[in-house]
């Protein structure tokens, strides 16, 4: 039970005594310590004033040996603690004691004159010191004084004996008050304590002592006079139960709940789990956590249940459960009563109870010497220690079998030493017989000898409500008693009544996480009884037993005895509990573990009923009822998309939590996939609710249509509500699409991690994993999903581990054979050995490329969804100058405060405090920032918040899917100082700066367009020079940057163009399309545009490293304009460039000119262009004469049309649109397809004529 629940319960029942606690304030005064301090100071000032008794005969100060020994034995005990123990001892002595003057043996207990006042004083001490100061000093003082064992238990048992004999008391009312005071102290002193990170240092120091004291209390309560204390406590509540509900007072209900608290505490007390550091050389001994003279058998669950049965405690539970909600207050008593039931069955396997049906119950258990009694059926180990020994022997036998399989048959007792020589002349030495089997065992032996420097710290954050500190062992007698109680509990309708009333209690609460422990107990109890009933149904259906258990009615084949837990209210509660636990930050993993356990049992019931109704040929009416119940369970569970999305996500992260959490996650996925498969085969239709926001336009239209008919009180509020109204609709579940989401690569990794623990798994659990992999690899044919090196290694190790005679070994061999057959074919067809080292990416582009080697073509729907607004990282900021940390936090907190994000700062501080607590326990742990969903967007988009996070030392992500990382190098002290500064300036808002300046005055942009790591691909270019803001508002920055890149590449000259071939010039529409394609390939992030095989070299472009220099202050404007002027003059002198030959020749000479940098060689360029033009004209004339389609005179006149300089520049763009230069199309011809004759097309020849006016 959590610490917060403990404090809440104590506060409820003992607030009435808070006024009396003032009497004890300042009661303990360490006057002696002050006097000693004054004497020491006086002696230091005047050494001669010391008392003669304080020095020995040699003049040296005498040593108080007794005091020194006391301080050495109890170094942590202060003088105030000693005084406190003395006061408690005085109160316990004044309470009473054995009356040795009496002739009765043993002597009866005689109460003191102020016994009631002493009990009240002790209770005030507990509340004033232990509760308020977070300590256990009073509790330990009571244990040392023997208050519980020597006084409270004896007083209650003596009072019960007198009431049983119907003896009269002098003051009956006072005696009842004393008994209630004794019960209150018992509840306080047996209340469960837990060691948590937030526990105080005093609590951590005294934790084990308190636990051992409580174990002594439990043993005394269960064994004193055969558990008469339990009967005495029940006697206190019997008069209240006999009253009518209307006649009971609030005090009566409080007493009933106090009694339930006492029984709950007795069930909850167990030994603390051993916690020895790995660095310690101390051997863990089981008895270290037990007090002297107490064994596990004295406080085991079997002993507790046996004592409860003898003293009618179980009968009290049945009575209260059957009358809850009618005779008893369900809200006041229901949760505590349910917790008692839960503690009775926690850790008990229902199969162990159901196995008793196959054996005859011994009638003479207390007569082991009777040979005629069937004691040969009773297990030989009937004690807790014996059962523990059986488990240990079974584990030892399993380990020995695995070792003998991996050892050679001959010379097994001799040692061996192997030398392995690897690459680079490295040699390794391996010793042991295991290394002689094969190479795999040799390398595995070598791997085990490695010592990893970076140790992984693993914490289990999901077992708070599901796992006890010790394994539960039940002997035969305890199982028989528990079986009888459970059958009576189910047959009498107590379970249905209790669950029905508690469902209404939880559904009426404001938040289901308000009482998280009670909610977890509720669903865990339901899950246990579901499992018990399901196993019993399967047992009777198989016909393995014909015995009729005691107290069982004809409820074998249906679930009527647990029908209340299958109500729609519980399904709604379960879904809400799951969604709330997952949505809150940080996530409640322990609650999600509880949800998965209950969900597993519900799916098991549904699958069992559906399979039985489909395969059974018996009563059709019963089969129809089973089918309806099975479909109803699934339809009520898979009711919302949010819940189904959580089920997709939980298995993806299950490997980060405890083995129990991982196991139940695997079971849920396995059963859910099996259920979906059965429903798909039977064509069962299920519908799920999806929600979407109503569009604002439609909402405004509806508002206008109804404005005349409905009077609007507050128009703005109504408009806002309608705008944000959520529309709920149902859609049919697509089983295939739903199934695909459970084959995510993270889920596959979870299964691989689970299978890697094959030594701890049963054959059935291994088969679950193989079924999953078979469905993914064989049925769905998703081969790349399992082409992973870690999976291959696990399969190899699993095959060597399994015995060759087992059935599961044959299934593993068949799967490995099929897997390697497909893998060899895939690696030969599409070699990608690097990809097997990592899990596959789940995006469609990566999956398509790895499977087929081709790029993914987006559908129209995906293109439309890609155009939806996406959040980009905020513009990076920096401080204008150097500031101290105090000033930095002042600026950033003030900026966020002015933006109205004060609530976000509060949430940030809370999560930083959570991280600070984790860092205090382990500095090397890696954590992530977990803000609320409403504020996660700001971590990406708000530049001020991103700078604040970096100032703290965090690493913000670059997308909504990336978490804000807390690096391991960030210490807890750094986080603590950051929290202090943020809190400081949050409390001083609005802050003032010098000259009344705004916080943003001290910040500036870093100049980067996007706050993300610079990682351009080969298809991206860098800007060689700055550009002015665009004049056309509809033109994107990508268009302008692409044009500048093309111009720069044309001027600089590229060497990819084949000599003698000009670039094809298309019409306006084709150029527009090409322009758009170039835009998508230039500056935008890669979107896996599909290119043909001829376009594979399209992205070989000039990088910006040619233009970027070390200094940003240097400008290349003068060189740029000088080069432009030279190009202009040469074009004017040569008369323009007409064909591909001229262009090619021009490029060559221009390249040499650029290399030499001489202006005088410009004439060479002109002569080269003119000579090539003359040759080209002859070729063109000859080709035109042979052409049938001779152009007209008007076309020839148009051919001499002037061409602008911009067109010439476009010709000079050196950016190939085709991959192979042989496939380039010249300006005068359009090549035909293979096998067809090429049809020449006449192109108009144009010359460039630039007048002097144009030149100016």
UniProtKB/Swiss-Prot annotation:
Signal peptide: none annotated. Residues 26-58, 695-725, 1052-1121, 1176-1256 are annotated as: Disordered. InterPro entries: Timeless, Timeless_N. It is found in: Nucleus. GO terms for molecular function: DNA binding. The keyword DNA repair applies. Belongs to the timeless family. Component of the fork protection complex (FPC) consisting of TOF1 and CSM3. This is Topoisomerase 1-associated factor 1. It comes from Scheffersomyces stipitis (strain ATCC 58785 / CBS 6054 / NBRC 10063 / NRRL Y-11545). The gene is TOF1.
